[in-house]
């Protein structure tokens, strides 16, 4: 059985990152994937050498603040990435990994809802910045899409 475990990003020492590391230990032969990993700011874990990243996003997103900037675009990354050669995909998703495209195998999502970036915008973007203004333009569409994906 070909198994893939996905985490949105590994840039902080948060709860979803901890869950991801525990799942990775439970499935020692699974492939591991995240959009971006920063070993200096994220959790150290036994399988960090096995962690695959998106080369482009790993280069662009080295801090959590950059992840916020790219959030609307990142939702599409998982929708268009081809996962058809996996039998099982387990996602630990607070934001974007839950958007994976349907495939023939099984998808188990440990989904942290609501997605704070969408439903608690003032906490996620506390200042009136350009990024927040642009994000607010996409907000109704992102909320609709988030509801559809999580249901």
Task: Annotate the PLM regions.
Residues 24-27, 83-84, 99-104, 150:
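Short, conserved loop/helix-junction motifs that constitute active-site signature segments
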Residues 3, 29-30, 107:
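Hydrophobic anchor at the start of a short beta-strand
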Residues 127, 132-151:
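Membrane-proximal helix-turn-helix segments that form the acceptor-binding/catalytic region
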Residues 88-91, 101-129:
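Active-site proximal beta-strand in glycosyltransferases
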Residues 1-13, 35-36:
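Nucleotide-activated donor-dependent transferases that construct or modify glycoconjugates
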Residues 29-98:
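Active-site donor-binding segments of glycosyltransferases and PAPS-dependent sulfotransferases
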Residues 16-26:
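Short amphipathic alpha-helix
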Residues 12-13, 40-42, 97-101, 116-119:
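Short catalytic/ligand-binding loop motif for oxyanion handling, primarily in non-cytosolic enzymes
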């Amino acid at each position: 059985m070909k198994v893939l475990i996905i985490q949105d990003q590994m840039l902080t020492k948060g709860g979803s990152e901890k869950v991801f590391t525990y799942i990775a230990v439970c499935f020692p032969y699974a492939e591991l994937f995240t959009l971006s990993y920063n070993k200096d700011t994220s959790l150290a874990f036994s399988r960090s050498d096995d962690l695959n990243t998106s080369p482009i996003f790993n280069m662009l997103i080295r801090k959590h603040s950059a992840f916020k900037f790219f959030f609307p675009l990142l939702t599409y990354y998982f929708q268009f990435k081809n996962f058809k050669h996996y039998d099982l995909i387990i996602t630990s998703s607070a934001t974007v990994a839950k958007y994976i495209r349907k495939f023939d195998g099984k998808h188990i999502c440990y989904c942290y809802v609501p997605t704070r970036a969408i439903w608690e915008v003032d906490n996620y973007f506390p200042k009136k910045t350009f990024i927040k203004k642009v994000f607010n333009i996409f907000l109704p569409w992102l909320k609709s899409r988030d509801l559809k994906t999580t249901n």
